[in-house]
Amino acid sequence: MSENIDVQATVTVTFPDGRNMSIPSGSSGYDIAQSIGHSLAREALAIRINGELADLGTAVTDDATVEIITFDHPGATGKHIFWHSASHIMAQAIEELFPGTKFGAGPAVEQGFYYDIASEHRFNEEDLQKIEQQMLDISKRSIDIRREEMPREKAIAFFSESRKDPYKVEILQDTLKEADSVSIYHQGAFADLCSGPHLPNTSKLKAVKLTNISASFWRGDSSRESMQRIYGIAFPSAKLLKQHLARLEEAKKRDHRKLGAELELFMLSQDVGSGLPIWLPKGAIIRSELEAFLKEEQRKRGYVPVYTPHIGNIDLYKRSGHYPYYSDSQFPPLTYKDDLGREEQYLLKPMNCPHHHLIYSSQLRSYRDLPIRMAEFGTVYRHEQSGELNGLIRARGFTQDDSHIYCRPDQLVDEICAAIDLTKFVFTTLGFDDIEVRLSLHDPENQGKYGGTEEVWKQAEKDVREAADRMEINYVIGIGEASFYGPKIDFIVRDALGRKWQLGTVQVDYVMPERFDLSYIGSDGKPHRPVIIHRAPFGSMERFIGVLIEHTAGNFPLWLAPVQVAVLPITEEVHAYAERVHQMLIDNGIRADLDIRSEKIGKKIREAEVGKIPYMVIIGQKEADSEEISLRRHRKGDQGSLTLQALKDMLVKEVRNKS
């Protein structure tokens, strides 16, 4: 007689560190976390199965590699899931407090989340506090967040009839028109169209701060409906929020717009126009020094300078594809009639690239001439939305340290490596030691978004990967983040407050040589296509300097400081000697100011400290008699006495070494 024995099937899961574990088939991400430890189960937010993110409740039914995602997961994956769910919780809170509100897009961003909303109510700071409290109330209700797969046509009916949300209906009928089914997330009476993943339960949210309200447009299109964008950030503990708010306070002190005004670096004026910064003398010195630094380094590395106009014929940008591809972010064409009555249109230059391609094609090139490395600090113009403008960091007129390298295919990987090396050199020289690299590749499922064939893209991406691997840089892959003409290597720096900024870039381009019919004569006597590398270590001078101001809190290294030394005589009797010292510094290339006002030395020192001047030379009768100086360093105080020769040697060496 035999017995039926119920043996539950098991599967093997493999963790990132290589460990294996046998679990019952159908176990959820939460079950797996619980089997590892109660602490991990409490902190678990989602699961990655065979490289794909999924909700924590997703069942594992086959052997798989798995990774439990927590808030502090490397690469900010956990934070983005948490903040994306927080945007849904905020939307639910708004819907409960302000019935009839409609919802556009609500993604996670670098530091938190936002939601674009359509409402007749104009939201204010008092409303934000009410919404915060409602979000915490939703958290206390411990509402399960549930995913539902729904046929697209049924989803259209759901959002049209039940939710009465025209924005979700538009997405379903437009962006998702090819989808057979879509995912919807429910939390209580609230529901949203979303691919997820999301938190398992609203109770994970323990602390929230809504930070800002700004204007926006549906789908970023200024011709569409205006919306209100509410920003916020949330955390799984009150302690983390407190730490974040402390960092925000420090960020306010470092705000480049605040410091830019206090240190007299740049100004913004509505008389000139939004997003068009004006460089004041001290800021112009910083920019000039940075440009000179890169120009000299480029000269050593074989670059040649070029200059191009600020406007160009619209046909040039149609040829390159920048128009109409970037037309939404460009200023309207300038239209006029020539002497024969023919209408011509010009654009404020949105990119430097097409102009450089014309320079290349202006003469016959041989394979022996390549690589040709052109470089220009070229000003370009983009019509950014007013709500997106942010001092120097997001402007409408800005200068790019643009270079285009024209090379043979057999030279390409070497040239990419050299461009990577230059970019890393620039960042480390300027104190950005924490650098991330992202390889931005195209989305093969959306080939129509890009120029060139799939075959060309495969080759370009192969070359970029080979160069990155040869340079031994750690990188992450960003699918769908490439430029329309080629893959790119983006450099993301982390500043003193831990914030990430995308600055430099290196891009490979097989498309523009075709569009501009660029060629060189090969060793076989026949024409061949060059490959182009677009390269900009700073990216935008304005953005880079804005980030640098906040990174250093305005305490620039000596070689960049607008005023490097303040010469501060104590009494009128030593003015003659102070003038001699001042002139000696000027003669040796040091930017020095002489303060001969009849103020007490304490006040002069305080003002120099506030002005963040790196060195203060104090001169009294004792110093004048011995022909020495007393030296103070910003934030470090008294450095003792020095001879004039020792002072000169020290300053010149520090400037030369860019230390």
From Swiss-Prot:
GO terms for cellular component: cytoplasm. Keywords: Aminoacyl-tRNA synthetase, ATP-binding, Cytoplasm, Ligase, Metal-binding, Nucleotide-binding, Protein biosynthesis, RNA-binding, tRNA-binding, Zinc. Zn(2+) binds at residues 353, 404, 534. It comes from the Bacteria. The keyword ATP-binding applies. Its EC number is 6.1.1.3. CDD domains: TGS_ThrRS, ThrRS_anticodon, ThrRS_core. This is Threonine--tRNA ligase. It comes from Chlorobium phaeobacteroides (strain BS1).
